[in-house]
């Protein structure tokens, strides 16, 4: 028996795996696809055939299944027989009730009599596109891809262990936009002008899943103090990102709390799974979730690898970024990831090494990249998102083909300035969170 199988058989508190699963242990086939297709025309004027007209005062309700959401205040503007909706005060949100899955969203933006400038975010603030500018008299269309998920799991068979829902232990997570019944699109920027939108469920789109802790999870408010939230803008509209990371998680608790089961319930052949742990794994004061880098941490990583391979997907290990003090606080877990990647022949993105170089290059400005000693600001998340994509290009050829053709890699020794979109207020009711001076 190889070392992988031995490590898996020795796990306590996780599913016991064997090298050759019995037929009854193999994953069930996915449920039949649910089709969803919506077309919306916004503002005054005549809606084209096949489109649903949406006026500025149409608020989302579960019964209707679509509408402006989270207190959005928009204005309908008429331009002859056509129109659009816009706002100059704050971002606005449009939500559609949909089943979980991947969605292709095509928006039309612009104004025949003025300039528009739009940033698009989805769900919990994932940045899809920035600075989409149209001159007066012009419109543009842009397609983005978003993932929608729910916390429910297929219930286990009678008398079988398992759960029917992801375990959420942090206050407020259950109400987060990433878990609700809706696909939410945020329109931001100096002058967003939304003309039309088409939303199509597309089960053939591959998914990039992400697992991790609060250094990776979506923020509740703000422009995104992590790399997954800012990743989509650097990817072609041919792949969805499902960020399943959450605060407080470790490689062990991600499995025992059914988060990994949720990922596996959506995973299909051709998908990708980026796994980053270490910050909470390194806390011995958390005895129920602590992992030792040379033993249990490696074993849990091998569970992720084995289960992902069973489903025909590609796993990538991402070493944790170092904290602001730029010491060696998570170094042992980063080095353990390197060992497992080499032993199991899986791709590795060494974010830990790149982050140490980056924090050194920032010098006194390193404070601008952090919200506190451990968690990133929007600027820090932006910098690491560029390094992650650069790592994908270098080390994960199958995933690199989804990187946008216009992506510009960043050298960690030469950090870029903060992009303008980080100055924008984002999230329902959230105040502006500018980059620190």
Language-model-detected regions and their locations in the chain:
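Alpha-helical cap/lid subdomain in secreted, periplasmic
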Residues: 258-405, 412, 425-437
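Conserved catalytic region of serine esterases and O-acyltransferases that act on ester linkages
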Residues: 20-39, 137-139, 159-168, 177, ...
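Bacterial N-terminal signal peptides
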Residues: 5-16
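Conserved SGNH/GDSL esterase-like catalytic core that processes O-acyl groups on lipids
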Residues: 179, 189-193, 200-210, 215-306, ...
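N-terminal secretory signal peptides that target proteins for export/translocation
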Residues: 1-2
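Short, structured coil segments at secondary-structure junctions
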Residues: 122-124, 235-237, 311, 344
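Compositionally biased, intrinsically disordered or flexible polar/acidic segments
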Residues: 20-221
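Conserved beta-strand scaffold positions in the cores of enzyme catalytic domains, especially
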Residues: 39, 241-243, 345-348
